[in-house]
């Protein structure tokens, strides 16, 4: 068999292969340098960045579940200026695009972040986390109302020339409605799914396990939900999808691509296996060779081929 093409295009961002990392599970990337060759990744998605430094939520803020984990980190980060000053320079030395995940308390916050990062050398694209509370609207998450999600997307789009990837929340009634809203507002690509809202209770203390009470559920438990939503969104809009949500191995990653994902992000698996991204990349290569696939793009949306219309 001839050479295999692994290159994909995620909304204007060229990736050497479809494997990247889920924000918040890979630090700023450099933490994993002792375990893997970061230059082999298709992209590095760094942890959520805000305008000002954030200490995050009180502890405990992580808990293991039977098929995944709960987290309520609270977007702990040093702030965008410190990120650009301290963390971005070493990332520039790696031959891998850097995607910065951004979060805000208001539409204006998102616009300012986009403007600041647009001028930062070494930032390849922005991933917009809309699963944040809108302080001006009583704390309702931007990602649960189409109009709010569109407003955030528009603010980012108007302040950057870089590819804009909007990360959708699964905690909605109709994921396709949200997808259409942000695509119409200027999103170049979509990332889904973010974590599902969950909780756990310690029966000995009779109290919630997390200090924040509720947290984001990730890991294998949410894979069927993520696959279903990616499948639906692929049929609803015509922009690339960055798929995530319970990807633990190459079989999972391939299933996400068959459902419609152009690229995939590895999250919770990084905590249990620091080499998960490399194992998944190698597994995708082996699958393609075994199945006679010459171009990984052939996999994207292939699970829809039996349908018409």
Curated annotation (Swiss-Prot):
Residues annotated as transmembrane: none
Origin: domain of life: Bacteria
Catalytically driven reaction(s): (S)-dihydroorotate + NAD(+) = orotate + NADH + H(+)
Residues at the active site: 132
Keywords on record: Cytoplasm, Flavoprotein, FMN, NAD, Oxidoreductase, Pyrimidine biosynthesis
Subunit structure: Heterotetramer of 2 PyrK and 2 PyrD type B subunits.
HAMAP family noted in UniProt: DHO_dh_type1
Keyword ATP-binding applies: no
EC number, UniProt record: 1.3.1.14
Location of this chain's protein in the cell: Cytoplasm
Principal subcellular localization: cytoplasm
Biological process, per Gene Ontology: 'de novo' pyrimidine nucleobase biosynthetic process; 'de novo' UMP biosynthetic process
EC top class, as a word: oxidoreductase
Entry-linked PANTHER family: DIHYDROOROTATE DEHYDROGENASE (FUMARATE), DIHYDROOROTATE DEHYDROGENASE (QUINONE), MITOCHONDRIAL-RELATED
Matches recorded under InterPro entries: Aldolase_TIM (IPR013785), DHO_dehydrogenase (IPR050074), DHOD_1B (IPR033888), Dihydroorotate_DH_1 (IPR024920), Dihydroorotate_DH_1_2 (IPR012135), Dihydroorotate_DH_cat (IPR005720), Dihydroorotate_DH_CS (IPR001295), Dihydroorotate_DH_I (IPR049622)
Annotated family: Belongs to the dihydroorotate dehydrogenase family. Type 1 subfamily.
Job of this protein: Catalyzes the conversion of dihydroorotate to orotate with NAD(+) as electron acceptor.
Name of the protein this chain belongs to: Dihydroorotate dehydrogenase B (NAD(+)), catalytic subunit
Gene that this polypeptide is encoded by: pyrD
Binding locations of FMN: 23, 47-48, 101, 129, 167, 193, 219, 245-246, 267-268
Cofactor(s) this protein requires: FMN
Molecular functions per Gene Ontology: dihydroorotate dehydrogenase (NAD+) activity
